[in-house]
């Protein structure tokens, strides 16, 4: 199973997180399948590769709690619903 989760980067006391698609059995710092964005909690910046995120969500990837909140704030799930309506 694939999850969308945060992978810690940066230095001490200055964490930046990459949002990655990764196998559930891998460690947090393990090898990821694909980088799909990043999140900087200090500067409150977020970059998301929305088409790639939508691809993984359509294939059944599950976001973790924090990633779910980030995607919800960016209104990614609305785009997912629009894409599903178009395909029906």
Curated annotation (Swiss-Prot):
Pfam families documented for this protein: Ribosomal_S16 (PF00886)
Gene3D superfamilies assigned to the protein according to its UniProt record, in alphabetical order: 3.30.1320.10
GO cellular component, as recorded: chloroplast; mitochondrion; small ribosomal subunit
Claim: Ribonucleoprotein is one of the keywords in the record: yes
Stored NCBIfam families: S16
Family designation: Belongs to the bacterial ribosomal protein bS16 family.
Protein name: Small ribosomal subunit protein bS16c
Top-level taxonomy: Eukaryota, Viridiplantae, Streptophyta, Embryophyta, Tracheophyta
Gene name of the record: rps16
